[in-house]
């Protein structure tokens, strides 16, 4: 029997500790400890984490680490790396860590070493990518492939899109990359607008090859291609698949020789470094892709071996939990001061909320505490001119992760210094604010002072790296992956299933059939849903 989280000694100690610390201000914490900005830092795999601007003391950190230990975080990390079936509800191993393991490592699933299979797929991906990049792979009519379109949804889209945007600086610029995920026909129409089918390759990404949205778009892609090529066999040169289901891939009409596999022990939201990343490898090349994998692996090893109080993913996970469960914070803002990371917050939304958006524990009981925060964000400095006002002076506590780089990939005058000056200024302003006395000293009228003062005491992490490289990106993604794992372990939930996604799929399939009944006589929903369907059926005919 698992001891309920809220009954653990460290949890109770943290509840008491929160009462003593909740009124402390970061101004005082920094004044009392001139070296706080040096002490509350950690560094690994090229990432420097400054967590000094958090509402914590040494005692807070000690108790949070104690909580992680009491909740069996060390044992669960070891279980994941061993290949145990820690995805309890689906009885599967969770081994995205094997996707980036070096060739000489050995990781067993049901007694079988999976690492050779991983590298066999990576080698096939590299061979295929080189053929596309060099022009050796040609379409049915002999034209060179110039357009790559990835069709997928969820983890089969968010990871590839994020990685492509993040590593666009390293991409081959004579190839265009587009991504289709939404079943809304507009997504397909706009993604294919202006493209020559004879120069276009579709990568169909679906673990089961039965995902409704992906298959709908894949069939539309095939029809789009056939209008130009008019030869079903010829179309084969324009489609490849990433899937675990060879039978369905063949049924669709893709040669299974052009199927790149991955495995049931890879969850969709953890799959960007598997064959799902084929579009990424084509864009940046096999060498850069392997550098990204090396960054993932290095962070995995740090997570596995570093003491919890110096362990970047553990520290970030514990800090997020601290605000979520004790301060009542409900969201986390991720704010990359790097335009190439513009899709990173959206990627983290799925990673975090699909993993830890759960209310049932591993032993089947309902939680009596908050689980996953809502993750959101935009690149700096854009966000400063939209939602930062709420973070500074609103009524909600919103912890923030700031991400920045010391070197820009695109030197342009003093742009990068301006960008980073804003990052540093925001973390300082959020922490220390501006008192009414400071505002008055500037000659501001008394009536206006409350409006122009800032409470501060808003917690932030700052992650700094030298520059955005494939290796850095891999380390950064793995950092958040393992932070999510840390939180899910402490909350005693299964971070690797997603049953909430399934119910909507079932209902959508049923309603899809009902939309074909224009009279609506077969509707058996609630009065609201029935009325909406009837109105839709009536108006779509106009």
From Swiss-Prot:
Catalytic activity: alpha-D-glucose 6-phosphate = beta-D-fructose 6-phosphate
UniProt-annotated location(s): Cytoplasm
Pathway entry: Carbohydrate biosynthesis; gluconeogenesis; Carbohydrate degradation; glycolysis; D-glyceraldehyde 3-phosphate and glycerone phosphate from D-glucose: step 2/4
Active site feature: 354 (proton donor), 385, 505
Entry-linked InterPro entries: G6P_Isomerase (IPR001672), G6P_Isomerase_C (IPR023096), Phosphoglucose_isomerase_CS (IPR018189), SIS_dom_sf (IPR046348), SIS_PGI_1 (IPR035476), SIS_PGI_2 (IPR035482)
GO molecular function, one term: carbohydrate derivative binding
Main location: cytoplasm
Enzyme Commission number(s) from the entry: 5.3.1.9
Keywords: Cytoplasm, Gluconeogenesis, Glycolysis, Isomerase
One of the protein's GO biological processes: glucose 6-phosphate metabolic process
Any matching Pfam family: PGI
One CC-aspect GO term: cytosol
Uppermost EC category: isomerase
HAMAP family associated with the record: G6P_isomerase
Family (UniProt): Belongs to the GPI family.
Role played: Catalyzes the reversible isomerization of glucose-6-phosphate to fructose-6-phosphate.
Name of the protein in question: Glucose-6-phosphate isomerase
The organism of origin for this protein: Nitrosospira multiformis (strain ATCC 25196 / NCIMB 11849 / C 71)
Gene name, Swiss-Prot/TrEMBL: pgi
